[in-house]
Amino acid sequence: MITCLRNWPLLLKRFSVHQIHQFTQLSGRFERPPQSGKSSRDPYLVTVVQGRSKKPRFPGERSNQRFGEDSWFVSSTPLAEVMGVADGVGGWRDLGVDAGRFAKELMSCCSGQTQLSDFDGRSPRNMLIAGFQELSHREHPVVGSSTACLATMHRKDCTLYTANLGDSGFLVVRNGRVLHRSVEQTHDFNTPYQLTVPPEDRKESYYCDKPEMAVSTRHSLLPGDLVLLATDGLFDNMPESMLLSILNGLKERGEHDLLVGASRVVEKARELSMNASFQSPFAIKARQHNVSYSGGGKPDDITLILSSVEVPNA
């Protein structure tokens, strides 16, 4: 059976990246946007987005809300702050498919759910289910597959709700320590759970995971907590201790300081991904699964959404 799982032998092959395209988008417009129904006392998120493509943009790629084959979105409603990341599965390139387009369209469909009148932000898994259903039932479906991680902060109870499918993920950092971290969902080494829309004439040849398989969690948040969403390009290359070291160096939690911190994280992860001698988390996992790998980082697209929980001044 042909599966839609990531083609990991391709990823294990070392290759040289001569040019890295960088696209940075400040997300200050997501900070305390004016919304009817939102109390001035409600907590809110200060959010920035940063990322790197592993290769220069190819013709036709839209850089907006994409870093290579990764995609992301950030949205705000009267009841919740919402964000998501998705990692398009690169194996589709062998079939001439833009692997990042599926991730982009999936995030667009999920983001669209936040505009519905009954959206309350407490079930990102339902948002993922509805978004994927919309994408897969289009008259002309977008072929491809992707991991997905969605998170919402509900304003009234200051609670983080998450849904994660695959090996993208999230962290909650409080007082310099990781309070919560998502768990990867994989079928085998470097073969994550993923949502898939196969070609119409080959549906029977593909095994596809379902959005209902996403792991849902909820976590109470406090002012000053950091919430981080990222694709595996970050987690496969940067140890948690190194990530914490950079985040703990933030002196303030304003938009500028968060952007500086996010940029440092992404740049360090990119540097490590190109280091052939670094014992990256990816290299360690390969060894644990008895997979032949020479060591070093894993060149990949990197997407990071970094948020700080804040409350209005009295």
Curated annotation (Swiss-Prot):
Enzyme Commission no: 3.1.3.16
Broad EC category: hydrolase
Residues that hold Mn(2+) 2 according to the record: 87, 232
GO process terms (BP): positive regulation of ubiquinone biosynthetic process; regulation of ubiquinone biosynthetic process
Gene3D superfamilies: PPM-type phosphatase domain
SMART domains in the record: PP2C_SIG, PP2Cc
Keyword Magnesium: yes
SUPFAM superfamilies, per database record: PP2C-like
Cofactor: Mg(2+); Mn(2+)
Catalytic reaction(s) noted: O-phospho-L-seryl-[protein] + H2O = L-seryl-[protein] + phosphate; O-phospho-L-threonyl-[protein] + H2O = L-threonyl-[protein] + phosphate
Keywords: Hydrolase, Magnesium, Manganese, Metal-binding, Protein phosphatase
Domain PPM-type phosphatase: 43-309
InterPro entries: PPM-type-like_dom_sf (IPR036457), PPM-type_phosphatase-like_dom (IPR001932), PPTC7 (IPR039123)
GO molecular function terms listed in the Swiss-Prot or TrEMBL record: metal ion binding; phosphoprotein phosphatase activity; protein serine/threonine phosphatase activity
Family recorded in the similarity comment: Belongs to the PP2C family.
Protein name (Swiss-Prot/TrEMBL): Protein phosphatase PTC7 homolog fig
Origin species: Drosophila melanogaster (Fruit fly)
